[in-house]
Amino acid sequence: ISTIKALLFLLFFVNQIINDWKKQNYGQVIRSVGPESHLEKGGTPTMGGILILGAIIFSCLCWGDLQSKFLWILLFIISSFGAIGFLDDYLKLKNQNSDGLSGKSKLFWQFSFALIAVSILYFSAETTQETSLILPFFKEFSLQLGIWFIFLSIFVIVGTSNAVNLTDGLDGLAIMPSVMDAGGLGIVAYM
């Protein structure tokens, strides 16, 4: 139900917002390196992450357990990584080139926000199960990670975020990698 509600939220707003962005020339600046086919994508409205994150946040607030610390940590990570992406896209539009935030700046902020979120999870854990590695098909087996939970979790959060960013690197249009990423994570979370 929450997925359907997020989709309806997107469908309700997406056309109006994309048309407004086209009028204001909020289009993707394409790198000159790479295949010529990517140049055709120049001018495609950018900052779609705002729509996707808006739908996710809306759905979480409507259907999530607002008493759960996990929901609020999820919203913190989504919002903070979304802010990094927004700033990156904003700088690209402002400067009219494909250079946004530097890679080092992005990684610094991603690691910083992930460290904050994971530290809260680790230090507020009520049981060792909360900081254990549980394999989807072998739920009876769990590996207690101790302090390594922090390092592994940061690696997974930053790595997952950058899996999409690096995949869409040439043209900056991340919808298909995002769909695949979200689908895979959704399946694992469901198990």
PLM features: residue spans?
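"…together with the soluble PPM/PP2C metallo-phosphatase catalytic core" -> "…together
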Residues: 1-191
